[in-house]
Amino acid sequence: MANVEETVANVQRKIDREKALINAANAMRQSTNNPAVLSRLDGQIKDGRRNIDYFESKLRDLDLQRTTSGVDNMSLQPGRSPTNPLTPPPKDNWDGYAQQDQGGYGGPQSQYSQLSGGEALQPPRAPFAAPPPATANKRPNYSKLDLIKYDTPHLGPRIQLMLTQLEFKLSVEKQYKDGIEKMVRLYQMEGDRKSKQDAEAKRIESNQKIQLLKHSLKRYEDLHVDIDGDGDDNDSLDIPSQRKPLSGQLSLRIHAVADVDHAATGRFSRGPETFVNIKVEDTIKGRTKPTRNDRWTDEVHDFSIDKANEIEITVYDKTGDHLLPIGMLWVRISDIAEEMRRKKLETELANSGWVAADKMGGHTGIQPDMQFQPPPGQSPAGGPGGGPTPAGVRPPGAPQPQTGPIMIDDWFSLEPVGRIHLTMSFIKNTGNKQPFDLGLGRKGAVRQRKEDVVEQYGHKFVQQQFYNVMRCALCAEFLKYAAGMQCSDCNYTCHKKCYPKVVTKCITQSNAETDPDEAKLNHRIPHRFENFSNMGANWCCHCGYVLPLGRKQTKKCNECGLTCHAHCVHFVPDFCGMSMEVANQILMEIKRTRRGQSSSGPGMSQRTLRPQSAAKPLPPTQPQSPGQPGQESPTQSDRYSYGKEQMSPPPGPPRQPSYPSSATSVDAARASYSTTGTASTGAPTSPTSGSRPPSGPRTQSSVAAAAAAMNKATQPGYGRSNTDYSPQSGRSSGSGYPTEQRMSQQQAPQPAAYDPSVYANIPSYPPSHQQPAPVPSYPTKSSYPLPQPPPPQSPPQHPQQPTPSQQKMPEQQALTQQPPSAVGEVPGKKVTPAANTQGTGKRIGLDHFNFLAVLGKGNFGKVMLAETKTTKQLYAIKVLKKEFIIENDEVESTRSEKRVFLIANKERHPFLLNLHACFQTETRVYFVMEYISGGDLMLHIQRGQFGTKRAQFYAAEVCLALKYFHENGVIYRDLKLDNIMLTLDGHIKVADYGLCKEEMWYGSTTSTFCGTPEFMAPEILLDKKYGRAVDWWAFGVLIYQMLLQQSPFRGEDEDEIYDAILADEPLYPIHMPRDSVSILQKLLTREPEMRLGSGPTDAQEIMSHAFFRNINWDDIYHKRVQPPFIPQITSPTDTSNFDTEFTSVTPVLTPVQSVLSQAMQEEFRGFSYSADFA
């Protein structure tokens, strides 16, 4: 409270000072008739009044903050704690809140939820519910270009932007001046008088620029008001991956300057000549003619730019032979491109009748089968009652594309004072430019390429191209729009030349990987980090990014002055008083000295337990490395990680010392399973701490088997087998288990008798499916096939008694199964089949098929229609070249795709594409899938617009497919019309699992940049960690496209689409039904934690929304609802529902010339599979 009072007094002093300046300017106006002086005084008075308005708005914010802090300390109701606020309303329709609380919409959810063995889940209430729309965060509708305009109403964000920009420009100009002074001294030593004079003139100009920058910086520092509640005003102002250099044609017209402080001249001499210099990346591109009236009539400059970031415009006064800079302006080229995109969109929407959701009227009527009415003068062209809408033709009433020239014409602020009138346009050079927003079309998915990882003391350095000004964490010098090295684990950032000098260990490295003899610096003085008011350009000493303004996210050491982000504090080593460069130099010298000494003792490689090699059991007293439960060392878990993704599983209990080696693996397994039930009955299991089963054994050694058994009962993640080498590979690894399990085991009664059926993840399985495997007498890392699940039917209530063949199963296979207690505790989390599951069906190969047609092509392969030679059954076969898989490091992603297919096969989900078989040849791998002859929804929506009923029907079936994936820990990440197939009975099947990610439960996150541009969620574009809520964002885009026959976010290329996703609000026809707008608004919420479906109940939130009020989910799941459309074919091999671009291609396998080595072929061992229903 004292800080607030102090800030209020400070703001009041600033208001008084501005008022005094305005009074002085008014007094001066009375004593002069000079037009130039009067114009300058008018500008000062206008600026002063604007500053007063800004300060008064900050005073109101402070008063509100003071009032809120007082209310927070009050108890609102008797007996209610201040820390237990009132229950907010749910994420659903705000106006329909009372209606939902009275029973929801139809209430069939409980019938469907029993299908997966769970209890009925209603939409979440507190604390998972979002606030009502009236209190939702408003996104500011401005760009960076808006902030540098003279009349911008966004003065607060402008102050933040200019403080950062001016501080950086000042530091760069000082470095430039130091370089010039060195040149002056060099030329003086050489006696080159002409070059010395030129350098001296540059030094004088640089000094003058420094004075301008200091003057401007002081002005903005005086205007800045530090309020704790201030955060970043706009997330899209600093997009780490999108502010990249651009190439194209720039047109710039300079009209006039005004309110500038001209150079002083003699009383009787003429005024100075004024001209403007235009620079692009320090290269002069144009210069205006000199003028004495601050105006130019025909100053148009057209020039091409190549991979440039910024334009610098400098206004000069020329007095005699001297040039004096009087005003400066910097414009990012990407900001010009973004402004032109927004203007183009605004022009299209001016008369279309489409508005943002918050501007919708009170249209509450529900139209039974809505077809949006076009504006007057246009005739409907799609849907029932109208002809089909051909591909590329815009839906009725949609905004029409703008084809005329778009120009930016405005007054922009000069620094430190003045303004300049500019007209600009920019045409990008893009190789993949497409017509702006002409309906829906096919677009391929993008995936972040796997980068070469360089490991340095636990850091996993990857080369990154930075489009912001970064600061090296080692040498503290800048990286200006350059490539650097960044650790993919902790985000430590440095120059490419500096990363070999880094010898401080990455904090994400576990203690087990620390060499006891590694070099250590006896300088353990922790920093005293505290919040500070960041008013200028300061950089994080760890990740290298510029710090935001304000106090919320910034820390500063009181002793040494080091600054960093609040979330980077725990990454900074305890080297207070010593720079990182000096610390690393000392550590390097220590290591060099030790390296020269005797190396008789064993090295690190002989002491560390490595997952790739067999390791002896640890002694009972030796604790294992702390870390996530069930998580192995980073070396193994990242070796085959899909897309180098950084998984963040839900938090769990810490590891404890491993089980004593005297216990056998079977005893450990028995004890763990027998105590799981008693340990779990004490308290309910939360969504983040529930059990989740691993998929395969890691070892046969007693210690590792015991640890794996114990982990299996409680660990949130599962350790999957990375490969399926023969037993001779001899790989093994150990893992710890949580405290609760060890304690419960010590208190357990006599272990239960060995019963394989208890450990199975299915109620029963046919005896014929079991193949007893011999138990080797040495540690192995071999994987055993899981029993094939039966077709979906009502499961028996009690497990059957094991047969003799089942009793002979090896202990390792028993350990791969899930205990019933884990299934009973969290019904939504199920066993994931191993990647090397062979299946139980008949083995097939390439000789069994004839290829008939090409059905589609993607970034990673092609899909062909094939029939079996004997039965003439039709299948769709996805063909991938092994050479491509290995070259692009896609081995693990191919395994992952197979595992996701097995998850879909497990219950034969009605809306997921099933896999019949996998096989391989020397050059290719093949996925044999069921053939869906109705084509995809992209083709059908191009033929004609969907009505509401049809879109709702498809959305409901897709929702159940995503629900099943999420219940099995899979996020889909590539939801789009192209990947939704239509069966001949009118139902859908979701296909293409190439971008799926496993082990993604509630609370888990990953960070790979992948997906189809129009469907990618903002958190993916912002390089943030994301969870399964990205699927619900894509679900919102999908519903929007099905209802309106166009995408909510449009652009000519991927960059424009990304900008639209981050900055634009989706638009809707003015008469669109309220329920449709509501679900889209809640699914297309940029904050993932506020998005519908982001809570622990996942799809249940969406299923209970008013948009699906008439849906009976049990009937949808069992296909008892009559589909609204039935596709037609003339024969079983008719491919008319597929794109002729693909079907016209001859279905042949192109020859592959390369020969893979034995080691490469070994990567695909165990890929073959055949389903029991094939």
Curated annotation (Swiss-Prot):
| InterPro entries listed in its UniProt record | AGC-kinase_C (IPR000961), C1-like_sf (IPR046349), C2_dom (IPR000008), C2_domain_sf (IPR035892), C2_fungal_PKC (IPR037778), HR1_rho-bd (IPR011072), HR1_rpt_sf (IPR036274), Kinase-like_dom_sf (IPR011009)
Q: Which residue intervals define the domain AGC-kinase C-terminal in the entry?
A: 1109-1174
Composition-biased stretches, type Polar residues, lie in 69-84, 596-611, 720-744, 808-820
- Amino acid composition bias (Gly residues), ranges on this chain: 380-389
Q: Quote the catalytic activity from the record.
A: L-seryl-[protein] + ATP = O-phospho-L-seryl-[protein] + ADP + H(+); L-threonyl-[protein] + ATP = O-phospho-L-threonyl-[protein] + ADP + H(+)
Q: Where does ATP bind?
A: 855-863, 878
According to UniProt, the name of this protein is: Protein kinase C-like
Q: Which organism is it from?
A: Cochliobolus heterostrophus (Southern corn leaf blight fungus)
